[in-house]
A protein has these predicted regions:
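N-terminal "arm"/small-domain region of PLP-dependent enzymes with the aminotransferase-like
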Residues: 2-67
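PLP-dependent aminotransferase class I/II
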Residues: 51, 72, 226-310
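Phosphate-binding glycine-rich loop
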Residues: 69-114
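Short acidic capping loops at alpha-helix termini that bridge into adjacent secondary structure
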Residues: 87-91, 112-114, 158, 190, ...
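Active-site pre-lysine segment of PLP-dependent enzymes
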Residues: 130, 148-158, 170-193, 197-236
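Conserved PLP-binding catalytic core of the aspartate aminotransferase-like
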Residues: 141, 292, 301-335, 351
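PLP-dependent enzyme catalytic core of the Aspartate aminotransferase-like
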Residues: 331-335, 340, 344-378
Length: 378
């Protein structure tokens, strides 16, 4: 065995063994590599960009960025509390909801304790859990989504957290409100359920179309249950680049999370953008409606080529390419399309495609057809 390095000896084993997060490629990186203009359909961003009101609000605070931001995010907390009919003390904004996942894990887990989620779910869950010294238990998928019965059966006396990405990233599947209701009745008092609703805006619209009840997450919080709902401004609101998200949960628990938050972590620019975005529902709705119209068209276009597409409740599609996803992604990038190969999720032939504008989706379908008609890429 190799001798441990000087600095490795200083770092706890669970940190030494920690795998980092690898994001989807930026347009700049992809364009430098491929030397072609690229459309990014990899990271589930809003293809219409941020609200003009959010842009104006961000510009207005730039001249004051020599001052620290409001550490308590008072205005944003108050606005979200009014919107969701909870107390301001129940709301904790962070620099994206992923930051709160790390805070939750560090607050509730220590070595010897565990968290539970599903296989092929949000890739930050294992990172946050391991960084806190905890163990992540992953149960098998059922029909490309969460098997809530399996998760309930996996709970033991050392379980403290259950992560439910609903809808799930990267498969795009959803568990209904009725299913979550039944599941919560099986969860013991020593476990906190994290309902990660990053894609809730799209799911709510699809659910209304399809006659399904999506989520009672905020009702659980209002009832005082051990549930924390996570949401973000990165998706429908188009603010992924400024990092703004939040959690809503029980007052006492959220107070611990607030203490764990890095000082001044939500910038003045992010707070201004988030507040303005909440005032421009029409902009978010434009993205949501475009997504609802385009999702079946894009899915059908891919399916007509003979590839399996999982029905989505989100702003992306999970597709089985039947070939090496990394090579498919590389060839699409050469054609000017950035998508996400899902090998890191344990799906070496699967790809994730953000649903774009009508024009972007047509460009993707043409490029995908051309790429997949080439010799097998296995």
């Amino acid at each position: 065995m190799d001798e441990m390095s000087e600095y490795g000896q200083l770092v706890p084993e669970h940190i030494r063994n920690l795998g980092g997060y690898t994001p989807g490629k930026s347009r700049r990186q992809a364009q430098q590599e491929s030397r072609v203009s690229c459309i990014k359909m990899a990271s589930n961003e809003n293809p219409f960009g941020p609200s003009p009101k959010a842009i104006t609000a961000m510009q207005a605070v730039l001249a004051e960025t020599n001052f620290y931001p409001d550490n308590d995010t008072s205005q944003l907390r108050q606005k979200l509390a009014e919107l969701y009919r909870v107390q301001p003390e129940q709301v904790v904004p962070t620099a994206g909801s992923t930051a709160l996942l790390g805070i939750i894990a560090r607050t509730l887990l220590t070595p010897g304790l565990n968290a539970i989620t599903s296989e092929r779910s949000f890739i930050v869950y294992p990172i946050a859990t391991q960084a806190a010294g905890g163990k992540l238990i992953r149960t098998p998928l059922r029909d490309d989504g969460y098997d809530l019965d399996a998760i309930a059966a996996a709970i033991d006396r050392n379980t403290r957290i259950i992560y439910l990405s609903n809808p799930n990233n990267p498969t795009g599947t959803m568990v209904s409100a009725a299913e979550v209701d039944r599941f919560l009745n099986k969860v013991p008092d020593h476990v906190v359920v994290i309902l990660d609703e990053a894609y809730c805006d799209f799911a709510q619209y699809f659910a209304a179309q399809r006659g399904v009840d999506y989520s009672h997450g905020l009702d659980y919080v209002r009832q005082g249950r051990k549930v924390v709902v996570l949401r973000t401004f990165s998706k429908a609101h188009g603010l992924a680049g400024v990092r703004a998200g939040y959690g809503i949960g029980p007052v006492e628990l959220m107070s611990y999370f607030a203490r764990m938050r890095t000082t001044f972590s939500v910038s003045s620019v992010a707070q201004a953008a988030a507040l303005a975005a909440l005032e421009d529902e029409a902009h978010a709705r434009k993205a949501i409606i475009n997504n609802a119209v385009q999702a079946p068209l894009l899915a059908d276009g891919i399916a007509e080529m003979g590839y399996r597409v999982v029905p989505t409740w989100t702003n992306f599609l999970y597709c089985e390419s039947n070939d090496d996803a990394a090579v498919v992604a590389e060839r699409l990038q050469e054609a000017g399309i950035i998508i996400r190969p899902l090998g890191p999720w344990g799906a070496p032939t699967a790809i994730r495609i953000t649903i774009g504008t009508p024009e972007q989706n047509q460009v993707f379908l043409k490029a995908f057809k051309k790429v997949m008609e080439r010799a097998a890429v296995r």
